[in-house]
């Protein structure tokens, strides 16, 4: 390149950094202003276009109305009445089929998109209605469930967790009520009567039974006296209603006392059977015939008691016991039979 051309070149002074930043800011601001002006122009154009479209639609509507008016004038009143009746029936059907309240329809209209003629959108709207109904049904207040009864009498009582705690508080606890105590079967009295001997204290009930054995004779005497009173009232010539009630009361008392005495005798016989069995087992172990004792079960004890009572009975008592036993067995067998065969012997 020749030197003359280089000398003829124009040289511009170098800008500082501050001047460069100022220049760049001005350029950016100018560009933003241009963009805003262009956006405003486009918005103005869109508004003008919308206004023209609205004017066109209004003109079209006016023309359509003007076209419909002369056609309505030619329609007869009978055709209008039929059309109104048909429209009324359709409206009733639609209102009867839909059980949605106006509030729900407003909510659904807000939530649903713009209406369309396509079947897919109608199906989606129906699904939306059903889902909304399910949601409202789930959120509805359920009736309060009643408390169920206890599974058994040993189970704790059922109470609602919302049950309010009583505001009353026990400041002073009442004194314990005095309880009656029978000294015959009291452990404190029996331990003193045995003089602190542990072997006799373990059999305190046996000692109490031996100490108060005379009460059994009193019971037998009382039962005999009550039977005499019953026989005297039954043989009375002029019996009143009060006498009849007294006879019933005395008979009830006799049966209760005799049952109590019979139970006491049965327990005594069971105790004697156990004592005799223990003695035999101890003798066998002492003789070396056995290494370990055999302990009777409750069923075996009952069988031995029945056998012992049967041997001690007289002839008539045995016959009565056997007859009662036979009737009991027959009744059990008849219950197990089918209903049609129960009457046939």
Curated annotation (Swiss-Prot):
<keyword id="KW-0698">rRNA processing</keyword>
<keyword id="KW-0687">Ribonucleoprotein</keyword>
<feature type="compositionally biased region" description="Low complexity">
    <location>
        <begin position="78"/>
        <end position="87"/>
    </location>
</feature>
<comment type="function">
    <text>Component of the 90S pre-ribosome involved in the maturation of rRNAs. Required for early cleavages of the pre-RNAs in the 40S ribosomal subunit maturation pathway.</text>
</comment>
<dbReference type="Pfam" id="PF06102">
    <property type="entry name" value="RRP36"/>
</dbReference>
<feature type="coiled-coil region">
    <location>
        <begin position="219"/>
        <end position="267"/>
    </location>
</feature>
<dbReference type="GO" id="GO:0000462">
    <property type="term" value="P:maturation of SSU-rRNA from tricistronic rRNA transcript (SSU-rRNA, 5.8S rRNA, LSU-rRNA)"/>
</dbReference>
<feature type="compositionally biased region" description="Basic and acidic residues">
    <location>
        <begin position="330"/>
        <end position="345"/>
    </location>
</feature>
<feature type="compositionally biased region" description="Basic and acidic residues">
    <location>
        <begin position="15"/>
        <end position="25"/>
    </location>
</feature>
<feature type="compositionally biased region" description="Acidic residues">
    <location>
        <begin position="32"/>
        <end position="43"/>
    </location>
</feature>
<comment type="similarity">
    <text>Belongs to the RRP36 family.</text>
</comment>
<feature type="region of interest" description="Disordered">
    <location>
        <begin position="312"/>
        <end position="345"/>
    </location>
</feature>
<keyword id="KW-0539">Nucleus</keyword>
<comment type="subunit">
    <text>Associates with 90S and pre-40S pre-ribosomal particles.</text>
</comment>
<protein>
    <recommendedName>
        <fullName>rRNA biogenesis protein RRP36</fullName>
    </recommendedName>
</protein>
<feature type="region of interest" description="Disordered">
    <location>
        <begin position="15"/>
        <end position="167"/>
    </location>
</feature>
<dbReference type="GO" id="GO:0030686">
    <property type="term" value="C:90S preribosome"/>
</dbReference>
<feature type="compositionally biased region" description="Polar residues">
    <location>
        <begin position="66"/>
        <end position="76"/>
    </location>
</feature>
<keyword id="KW-0175">Coiled coil</keyword>
<feature type="compositionally biased region" description="Polar residues">
    <location>
        <begin position="108"/>
        <end position="119"/>
    </location>
</feature>
<keyword id="KW-0690">Ribosome biogenesis</keyword>
<dbReference type="InterPro" id="IPR009292">
    <property type="entry name" value="RRP36"/>
</dbReference>
<feature type="compositionally biased region" description="Basic residues">
    <location>
        <begin position="143"/>
        <end position="153"/>
    </location>
</feature>
<dbReference type="GO" id="GO:0005730">
    <property type="term" value="C:nucleolus"/>
</dbReference>
<feature type="compositionally biased region" description="Basic and acidic residues">
    <location>
        <begin position="312"/>
        <end position="322"/>
    </location>
</feature>
């Amino acid at each position: 390149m020749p030197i003359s051309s280089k000398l003829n070149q124009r040289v511009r002074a170098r800008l500082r950094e501050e001047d460069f930043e100022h220049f760049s800011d001005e350029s950016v601001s100018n560009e933003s202003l241009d963009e805003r002006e262009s956006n405003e122009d486009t918005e103005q154009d869109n508004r003008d276009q919308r206004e023209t479209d609205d004017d066109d639609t209004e003109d079209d509507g006016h023309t359509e109305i003007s076209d419909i008016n002369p056609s309505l004038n030619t329609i007869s009143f009978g055709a209008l009445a039929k059309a109104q009746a048909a429209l009324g029936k359709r409206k009733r059907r639609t209102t009867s089929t839909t059980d949605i309240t106006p509030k729900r329809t407003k909510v659904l209209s807000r939530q649903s998109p713009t209406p369309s003629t396509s079947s897919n959108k109608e199906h989606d709207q129906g699904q939306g209605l059903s889902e909304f109904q399910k949601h409202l049904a789930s959120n509805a207040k359920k009736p309060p469930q009643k408390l169920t009864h206890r599974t058994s009498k040993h189970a704790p009582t059922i109470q609602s967790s919302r049950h309010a705690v009583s505001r009353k508080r026990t400041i002073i606890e009442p004194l314990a009520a005095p309880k009656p105590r029978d000294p015959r079967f009291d452990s404190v009295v029996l331990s003193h009567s045995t003089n602190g001997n542990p072997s006799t204290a373990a059999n305190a009930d046996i000692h109490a039974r031996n100490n108060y054995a005379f009460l059994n004779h009193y019971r037998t005497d009382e039962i005999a006296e009550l039977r005499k009173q019953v026989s005297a009232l039954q043989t009375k010539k002029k019996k009143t209603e009060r006498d009849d009630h007294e006879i019933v009361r005395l008979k009830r008392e006799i049966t209760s006392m005799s049952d109590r005495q019979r139970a006491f005798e049965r327990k005594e016989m069971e105790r004697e059977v156990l004592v005799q069995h223990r003695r035999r087992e101890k003798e066998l172990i002492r003789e070396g015939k056995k290494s370990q004792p055999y302990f009777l079960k409750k069923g075996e004890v009952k069988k031995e008691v029945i056998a012992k009572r049967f041997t001690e009975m007289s002839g008539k008592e045995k016959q009565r016991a056997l007859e009662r036993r036979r009737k009991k067995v027959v009744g059990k067998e008849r219950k197990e039979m089918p209903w049609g065969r129960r009457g046939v012997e």
